[in-house]
Amino acid sequence: MKYRKQLLVLFFAYFLVVNESEAFLGSLFSIGSKLLPGVIKLFQRKKQRALMKRDLQDRMDPYQRNLKLDRYLKQLALD
C-alpha cells in the first residue's frame, strides 16, 4: 500500500510537470508563430530594397550601362 501511494504521488507530480511544460511550450510556440512571419517579411523587404537600390545605382552609373551595352553587342556579334 505504501508503494502504491508513492507511485500515485509520483504519477501526479509527473503529470503536473508535463502539463505545465506543455502549456509553457505551447505559449512560446504561439508567440513565435505570430512573430516569425513579421521577422521574415522584414528581412525580405530589406533584401528587396537592397536589390532596388542596386538596380537604381546601375541605371544611374554610365560606366555600368556601357559595360552592359558592350556585353549585349558582343552577344549580337557572335550570333
Curated annotation (Swiss-Prot):
Keyword Secreted on entry: yes
Propeptide residues, chain positions: 49-79
GO cellular component: extracellular region; membrane; other organism cell membrane
GO biological process, one term: killing of cells of another organism
Identification of the protein by name: Peptide Im-5
UniProt entry keywords in alphabetical sequence: Antibiotic, Antimicrobial, Cytolysis, Membrane, Secreted, Signal, Target cell membrane, Target membrane
Role noted for this protein: Antimicrobial peptide that may act by disrupting the integrity of the bacterial cell membrane. Has antibacterial activity against Gram-negative bacterium E.coli NBRC 3972 (MIC=10 uM) and against Gram-positive bacteria S.aureus NBRC 13276 (MIC=2.5-5 uM) and B.subtilis NBRC 3009 (MIC=0.5-1 uM). Also shows potent activity against antibiotic-sensitive and -resistant Acinetobacter baumannii (MIC=1.8-3.6 uM). Shows cytolytic activity against human and sheep erythrocytes. Toxic to cricket A.domestica.
Leader sequence residues: 1-23
Domain of life: Eukaryota
Entry keyword annotation includes Magnesium: no
Any GO molecular function: toxin activity
Protein's organism: Isometrus maculatus (Lesser brown scorpion)
UniProt free text on domains: Amphipathic and cationic peptide with an alpha-helical structure.
Family under the similarity heading: Belongs to the non-disulfide-bridged peptide (NDBP) superfamily. Medium-length antimicrobial peptide (group 3) family.
Expression by tissue: Expressed by the venom gland.
More info: Fragments comprising residues 10-25, 1-19, 7-25, 1-22, 4-25 and 1-23 have been detected in venom but it is unclear whether they have a physiological role or are simply due to degradation.
